[in-house]
């Protein structure tokens, strides 16, 4: 018999009552984990700049992070023409790759006794790789450009072309 004034809980209500504190603990643990990671990054950066950090509270960590992100955003607004870091890294890589290919070519042309056929093959391969890198970048650049559908002409659908030309479309079935 139930005690007067006491309600029975359904299984769902009991499940929620038990799991809510567990979920809250996990959420807090996750927040603290990322705050600790931010703290480590901030301390490393401040040590590299010669600043001594005695203690950082959670509010300090968040404040420094927000200030850093605002500074980065202002820097992007102030220099809109500066290439993104990925592009700078790609340009540096390409310049280093080209320099290395030049040095390989120089060695093959100046050191006697090296197989010229192998050297020619190697230089062709290096050239093909450099060309492929440039083509991949162009494809990525085209994919990132916004598409203006108003500027494009309407193309006929494949069915309209089939009707007008009488050609059959190959199908695997």
UniProtKB/Swiss-Prot annotation:
Provide a Gene Ontology MF annotation, just one: RNA polymerase II cis-regulatory region sequence-specific DNA binding
Q: Pfam families annotated for this entry?
A: Hairy_orange, HLH
User: Residue limits of the bHLH domain?
Assistant: 15-72
The entry's keywords: Developmental protein, Differentiation, DNA-binding, Neurogenesis, Notch signaling pathway, Nucleus, Transcription, Transcription regulation
Q: List the GO cellular component terms.
A: nucleus
Chief subcellular location equals nucleus
Domain Orange: from-to ranges: 93-126
Region feature Disordered, mapped onto this chain: 147-173
Disulfide-bonded cysteines: none
Q: Where in the cell is it found?
A: Nucleus
SMART domains, alphabetized: HLH, ORANGE
Inactivation phenotype: RNAi-mediated knockdown of the protein in the type II neuroblasts lineage results in an increase in the number of type II neuroblasts. Simultaneous RNAi-mediated knockdown of the ETS protein pnt restores normal neuroblast numbers.
Question: Might you name a Gene Ontology BP term for this protein?
Answer: somatic muscle development
Q: Where is the composition biased (Basic and acidic residues)?
A: 151-173
Give residue numbers for sequence motif WRPW motif.
170-173
Q: Name the InterPro entries for this protein.
A: bHLH_dom, HES_HEY, HLH_DNA-bd_sf, Orange_dom
How the protein assembles, per its UniProt entry?
Answer: Transcription repression requires formation of a complex with a corepressor protein (Groucho).
Q: What does this protein do?
A: Transcriptional repressor of genes that require a bHLH protein for their transcription. May serve as a transcriptional regulator of the Achaete-scute complex (AS-C) genes. Contributes to the neural-epidermal lineage decision during early neurogenesis. As part of the Notch signaling pathway, required to maintain the self-renewal and identity of type II neuroblasts by regulating the expression of the transcriptional repressor erm.
Tell me the domain comment: Has a particular type of basic domain (presence of a helix-interrupting proline) that binds to the N-box (CACNAG), rather than the canonical E-box (CANNTG). The C-terminal WRPW motif is a transcriptional repression domain necessary for the interaction with Groucho, a transcriptional corepressor recruited to specific target DNA by Hairy-related proteins.
PANTHER family of this UniProt entry?
BASIC HELIX-LOOP-HELIX TRANSCRIPTION FACTOR, HES-RELATED
Recorded protein name is Enhancer of split mdelta protein
Query: What is the species of this protein?
Result: Drosophila melanogaster (Fruit fly)
